A protein has these predicted regions:
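Extracytoplasmic
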Residues: 134-168, 353-361, 478
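Extracytoplasmic gate region of multi-pass secondary transporters
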Residues: 153-158, 336-388
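Helix-breaking motifs and short loop linkers at transmembrane-helix boundaries and internal kinks
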Residues: 165, 196, 217-222, 251, ...
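Central cavity-lining transmembrane alpha-helices of secondary-active solute carriers
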Residues: 176-190, 381-393
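Structural signature of the two symmetry-related core transmembrane helices
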Residues: 199-214, 405-420
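Short hydrophobic/alpha-helical segments at membrane-entry points of transmembrane helices
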Residues: 220-228, 428-434
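Cytoplasmic helix-loop-helix junction between adjacent transmembrane helices
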Residues: 227-264
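Glycine-rich segments within core transmembrane alpha-helices of 12-TM secondary carriers
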Residues: 254-277, 281, 297, 467-479
Length: 541
């Protein structure tokens, strides 16, 4: 990415010598000749912004003033998502120049320097190495690709059921059956502890594209459902392993941030699936077009493979002979309490989140009279900005305030908001949807980060594979419950709202019982267990 300089010009009421002295004393500037001074870029910030100050006598009647031209340089150079960071980088540059100007004014007025400037929301709280940044961007690209494919069945369940002549109960069973893909995901995710994170991620990306193309050609609901079973497993593999990998690879103090960036990429893929909804209004068969687009994402696989490397933490662990990787009994013998608590949370939140997501469009069309185009507008308005802000704020708060309070409070409020959404109409429908998306984004980041942090590297994928299966069982249970009770309760909205009670209670009761991992190193939170009888780590508390 080109290093584009950015400039500000200000006039200070002091001679050049005084301004130069202030720049050297307060900003650590060094003379570069010809009235120019340079401020080195701080190595612990990203982007690392360097400043160049050019001082010239002011051309005014009174004389004695100085024109200061401040130029800032520094970029974030990453593949796939460099465009996303440009607005945040622009804000960071503007703040850096403004801070330098205010510091000079304070020095010339004999005041203390202003407090250090805050990190721009959306930029890393600590610096990533080039390798870490590239890894995060590439894993995020993989998740964006599979998230698009993962969202299609739920988003297009209405047109699909109409095309195949399926009832609410039948499509609910089909959606539930796709959760059988967890059996494949259980193996593919767990094997990442034995064969590495990179392999599992790439298998998911390529396989998801192939199965998406097969879904576009499915002649009947049975064939389509069978393809989606495999689709679900492949998507779950990539999403779960990529999430673990970015948390594993992130620098200390930025694990929740890395998780939030990956979640945003997943949200981008989901949003693109919403954009394709109007295609389903064109003809009874055009719901197949978004699945064809999903198949075309295989063209991105070579670029993802080229930039994706193995995590440094896993590479170091794989070289050791005193550690056994991927042993299931270690999860239950050494980390039983953590696994049980996280399993309860995964099950009960999935009981609500799955029917809430999968049946939302059907609820909007059947109960609220929305067309697919109306739904696309609704989801764009209530999902895009609230989801973006929620994920960004959640990652920041999870680092600053802790994982547990953010996860517990946000997820409880999200469940309550979504339940109200399925029981209301009019303005409340829109506001509750936006609130639920915002809160779920914030709470989900904090909770997901805990899933990755609370298990050591050698069983991180194995434990999360089992948690994934627990969540899938919860999803299937919720789909069957909501679909089966729809007619009895007078509509899909009421039956989905009923499934939210457990999610609300678990956020308030179980989440606070989890260990806190914020402001602790990953090795301190979940130290590696050696095979020695008396090792220096001991069992994880």
């Amino acid at each position: 990415m080109p290093r584009v300089p950015r400039s500000s010009l200000v006039r200070l009421a002091a001679p050049p010598d005084a301004v130069a002295a202030a720049a050297v004393e307060r900003l650590g500037a060094r003379p570069a000749g010809d009235g120019t001074y340079e401020v080195a870029a701080p190595p612990d910030e990203q982007p690392a912004i360097g400043l160049t100050l050019r001082l010239t006598p002011a051309d005014d009647e009174g004389g004695g003033g100085t024109d200061v031209a401040i130029t800032s340089t520094g970029e974030i150079d990453i593949p796939f998502f460099g465009w996303w960071f440009q607005p945040f980088v622009f804000i960071a540059h503007r703040r850096a120049r403004a801070y330098a100007i205010e510091t000079l004014r304070a020095a010339l007025d004999g005041r203390h320097s202003p407090p250090p400037r805050k990190t721009v929301v959306g930029l890393p709280p600590v610096a990533f190495s080039p390798e870490q940044a590239t890894f995060l961007a590439t894993a995020s690209a993989a998740v964006a690709v599979v998230s698009f494919a993962a969202a299609l069945f739920g988003q297009l369940s209405g047109p699909i059921s109409d095309s195949f002549g399926a009832s609410d109960a039948t499509i609910g069973v089909a959606l539930a059956l796709t959760r059988l893909g967890a059996l494949f995901a259980l193996f593919a995710i767990a094997i990442a502890d034995r064969r590495g994170r990179r392999t599992s991620i790439l298998v998911g990306v390529v396989g998801s594209a192939v199965v998406c193309a097969l879904s576009a050609l499915a002649p009947n609901l049975a064939t389509f459902t069978a393809a989606q079973v495999l689709q679900r497993g492949l998507v779950g593999t990539t999403g779960t392993v990529a999430f673990l990998a970015v948390v594993e690879e992130a620098p200390e103090g930025a694990r929740a941030y890395a998780a939030s960036m990956l979640a945003l990429a997943g949200g981008f893929g989901f949003s693109f699936s919403v954009v394709t909804l109007p295609l389903a209004d064109m003809a009874p068969w055009t719901w197949r077009l978004p699945f064809a687009l999903g198949g075309a994402t295989i063209l991105l696989a070579p670029a993802i493979a080229r930039h994706l490397r193995e995590t440094a933490r896993y590479t170091a662990l794989a070289a050791r002979t005193d550690v056994v990787r991927g042993r299931v009994q270690d999860v239950f013998e050494r980390h039983r309490r953590r696994f049980v608590l996280l399993g309860i949370v995964a099950f009960l939140t999935s009981v609500f989140s799955a029917p809430s997501s999968q049946f939302m469009n059907k609820y909007l069309t059947d109960i609220r009279g929305f067309s697919n185009t109306d739904i696309a507008l609704f989801r764009t308005v209530t999902t895009a900005v609230p989801g973006l802000v929620g994920v960004l704020l959640g990652g920041r708060l999870a680092e600053a305030r802790g994982r547990r309070p953010v996860a517990g409070i946000a997820l409880a409020l999200a469940a309550a908001s979504q339940m109200i959404f399925f029981l209301s109409g009019g303005v409340v429908l829109w506001t509750m949807s936006a609130a639920a998306i915002f809160l779920a984004g914030a709470g989900g980041i904090a909770l997901g980060t805990l899933d990755a942090e609370l298990f050591p590297t050698e069983v991180r994928s194995t434990s999360n594979a089992m948690l994934y299966v627990v969540g899938v069982v919860g999803s299937a249970s919720g789909l069957l419950l909501a679909g089966g009770l729809s007619d009895r309760l007078g509509g899909i909205g009421r039956s989905v709202a009923l499934t939210g009670i457990g999610s609300f209670l678990v956020a308030l009761i179980v989440v606070p019982m989890l260990p806190e991992s914020a402001a602790r190193s990953l090795d301190d939170v979940s130290p590696t267990q050696t095979t020695a009888e008396h090792d220096e780590y001991g069992p994880d508390p």
